[in-house]
């Protein structure tokens, strides 16, 4: 299987997929005061198949049962990723209102019912506990995605401290939003967008570098100085009652709901490869998978007749989704800017970018 970088290295490399952010962030937000939360919405083209895989011990989700391949509804109109813990699920009401206004959803007598699964992160300790997303956040994130698409704006997804990633933490460091994409030799493109808010670290405390050595080379990172590594090792982990990394992987391949679910399951390995530990009892790690069906592709691998004809394609797309999600995690952490005094990777390890100045907040 040959993987090639897609043009924007973004989930929006998949035609019809649109991403919008909305957040409120006070410049003086602190741990316990001010606004520091937001949402990220993924809009899909009509006829997009959806599935989900949930591995964390404390998930906060919406409409995930509906995505079980055994159930009747196949298509998804949008996916909500939100801060605010369970309160943030209120943002889905705004997403549904926006979709209804644009006549998207299951057509029923008298109107439409939009299908909007979603998941949330626990970020209530960053900023004021009572400052959390509302329905208006979801509506405005949808509008931002739509405006970027129809207005001819740059379709590249904003990363770092934006949208649902504003209050996110990755272990002891600032987390955020990341995205990545890959095009397969067989034709389909696979992309991911992730909100990194993990209990586990994305950095090896012994080296100051990512766990995945492949990513060290890809992002041209260098070993930080011993002083910077020592400073990082002294940071105490803010082990909280709830964390969670949530994301969406998408492809333009044609997949059934069951195949889509297998892709979501495979993509979870991208979290395990870049975050240690992952899928803990304190996380609610949830990954949605979307297949727009714009590209008809057949995997090159032969499979026994007794197996599903999708097996080879599922394997290829799943492996690519795993890689995309892993890369997106590191993009999120490298792009993050400090909020409420939470240190960033760039601030703690300037030596990883060839700079020898001391660490701190970015």
UniProtKB/Swiss-Prot annotation:
Give the InterPro entries listed for this entry. ArgJ-like_dom_sf (IPR016117), Peptidase_S58_DmpA (IPR005321)
The protein's location, in the record's own words, is: Cell membrane
UniProt-listed Enzyme Commission number(s):
3.4.11.-
Q: Reply yes or no: does the keyword Transmembrane apply.
A: yes
Annotated Gene Ontology cellular components are: plasma membrane
The UniProt transmembrane annotation reads 32-52, 75-95, 106-126, 148-168, 176-196, 287-307, 329-349
Q: What is a biological process (GO) this protein takes part in? A: proteolysis
This chain's function reads: Aminopeptidase.
* Name of the molecule in the record: Uncharacterized aminopeptidase ML1167
